[in-house]
């Protein structure tokens, strides 16, 4: 094992693995590649700004300090960090890749895996919360904030461990025949294990939402009311967008784990699949704010304050420091604002 870790600072190891798994090493900085990198960086900056606005909105307004919004904020935090990780990955790609040491390469790729893991576990937590809220179960008790934070902390700890396994030793250094083509320093078995775990979790989430849907459709009174159906629709949209964005990347990684080296040319185009997957982190904040008028108002407030600071006053401008006023119901998502709530979340304020 000591011999393995001694290779972590060897600057020639990355080149050795790329030479083995790639047919050609096209690392030149062409104009098209520079344009693509610039576009991805701009996209990631938008991801960071959007999710930061969601986090600020959730943190600054006590109206959103419910279980559901804490999990929503956790998902926004993972998306924000994903944007940062994608920027770092882009800046350290291309010709820069071959100058990295293995430990730097593991840090570059591991950060993306950690944020992806956090997103998957956040979706699982949201699904469980929906089930708990539907069953009216008092899950968190009097110290609910502490327990929810512990749950969120545990999800990040598991994500760190899962994303850090390669740097801890589960890699293919000195075992070229076991290497992934898409991620040349990762062992194929590790890639297969991670994708399998994510796929099983996502299937479990889908099954849970199907169960919730049938329970809601077969129930009466407030359980099957428009408020509950609107919440179910929102979480379904969030989950559906995640699956649509990440399914191509998961598929290419599954193919990578079973395909012999240099036998599947499509694997050399994997970066397009991962670029498409980044759209998920961009779309999530749009979904939150589209489905909740209150959250949309709170998210846009910093932008309105900035415009006032620039001397541009909107028609409904006012004191930047005023409190968030109650909103009139304008959709099924807000009609249940004063319905009885369960201990796990505030029905009128939940967006997912």
Swiss-Prot record:
The UniProt record lists the keyword Ribosomal protein? no
Cite the entry's keywords alphabetically: Cell membrane, G-protein coupled receptor, Glycoprotein, Lipoprotein, Membrane, Palmitate, Receptor, Transducer, Transmembrane, Transmembrane helix
The organs and tissues expressing this protein are described as: Most abundant in heart and lung; low, but clearly observed in kidney, liver and thymus; much lower but detectable in brain, testis, stomach and intestine. Not significantly detected in any of the sections of embryonic day (E) 14-18, except in embryonic brain.
Query: What GO biological process terms are annotated to this protein in UniProt?
Result: actin cytoskeleton organization; excitatory postsynaptic potential; filopodium assembly; G protein-coupled receptor signaling pathway; negative regulation of excitatory postsynaptic potential; negative regulation of smooth muscle cell migration; negative regulation of vascular associated smooth muscle cell proliferation; positive regulation of establishment of endothelial barrier
Does the keyword Lipoprotein belong to this entry? yes
Ranges in the Cytoplasmic compartment?
60-66, 129-147, 211-233, 293-352
One GO cellular component assignment for this chain's record is: plasma membrane
| Membrane topology classification | Multi-pass membrane protein
Tell me where the transmembrane regions lie.
35-59, 67-95, 110-128, 148-173, 190-210, 234-255, 272-292
Which stretches does the entry tag as region Disordered? 333-352
Q: Where is the lipid attached (S-palmitoyl cysteine)?
A: 305
Extracellular compartment spans = 1-34, 96-109, 174-189, 256-271
Q: Where in the cell is the protein located?
A: Cell membrane
Q: What does this protein do?
A: Receptor for the lysosphingolipid sphingosine 1-phosphate (S1P). S1P is a bioactive lysophospholipid that elicits diverse physiological effects on most types of cells and tissues. Receptor for the chemokine-like protein FAM19A5. Mediates the inhibitory effect of FAM19A5 on vascular smooth muscle cell proliferation and migration. In lymphoid follicles, couples the binding of S1P to the activation of GNA13 and downstream inhibition of AKT activation leading to suppression of germinal center (GC) B cell growth and migration outside the GC niche.
Tell me which family the UniProt entry assigns to this protein. Answer: Belongs to the G-protein coupled receptor 1 family.
Protein name according to UniProt:
Sphingosine 1-phosphate receptor 2
Q: Supply the source organism for this entry.
A: Mus musculus (Mouse)
């Amino acid at each position: 094992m000591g011999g393995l870790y001694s290779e972590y600072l060897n600057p020639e190891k990355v080149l050795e693995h790329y030479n083995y798994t790639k047919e050609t090493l096209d690392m030149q900085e062409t104009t098209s590649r520079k344009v693509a990198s610039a576009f991805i960086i701009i996209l990631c900056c938008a991801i960071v700004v959007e999710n930061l606005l969601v986090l600020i909105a959730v943190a600054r307004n006590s109206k959103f300090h419910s279980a559901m919004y804490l999990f929503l904020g956790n998902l926004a935090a993972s998306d924000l960090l994903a944007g940062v990780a994608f920027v770092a990955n882009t800046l350290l790609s291309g010709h820069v890749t071959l100058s990295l040491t293995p430990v730097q390469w593991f840090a570059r790729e591991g950060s993306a895996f950690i944020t992806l893991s956090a997103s998957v576990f956040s979706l699982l937590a949201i699904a469980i919360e929906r089930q708990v809220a539907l069953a009216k179960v008092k899950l968190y008790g009097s110290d609910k904030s502490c327990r929810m934070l512990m749950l969120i902390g545990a999800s990040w700890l598991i994500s760190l461990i899962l994303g850090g396994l390669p740097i801890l030793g589960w890699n293919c250094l000195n075992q070229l025949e076991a290497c992934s083509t898409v991620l040349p320093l990762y062992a194929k078995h590790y890639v297969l294990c991670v994708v399998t775990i994510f796929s099983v979790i996502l299937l479990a989430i889908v099954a849970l939402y199907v169960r919730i849907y049938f329970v809601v459709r077969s129930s009466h009174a407030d359980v099957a009311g428009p408020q509950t159906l609107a919440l179910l629709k929102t979480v379904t949209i969030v989950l559906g967008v995640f699956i649509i964005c990440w399914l191509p990347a998961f598929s290419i990684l599954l193919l990578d784990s079973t395909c012999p080296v240099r036998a599947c040319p499509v694997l050399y185009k994997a970066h397009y699949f991962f670029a498409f997957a980044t759209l998920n982190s961009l779309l999530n904040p749009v979904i939150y704010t589209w489905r909740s008028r209150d959250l949309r108002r709170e998210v846009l407030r910093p932008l309105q304050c900035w415009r006032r600071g620039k001397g541009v006053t909107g028609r409904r401008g006012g004191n930047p420091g005023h409190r968030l006023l109650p909103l009139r119901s304008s959709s099924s998502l807000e009609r249940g604002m004063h319905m009885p709530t369960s201990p796990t979340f505030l029905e009128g304020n939940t967006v997912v």
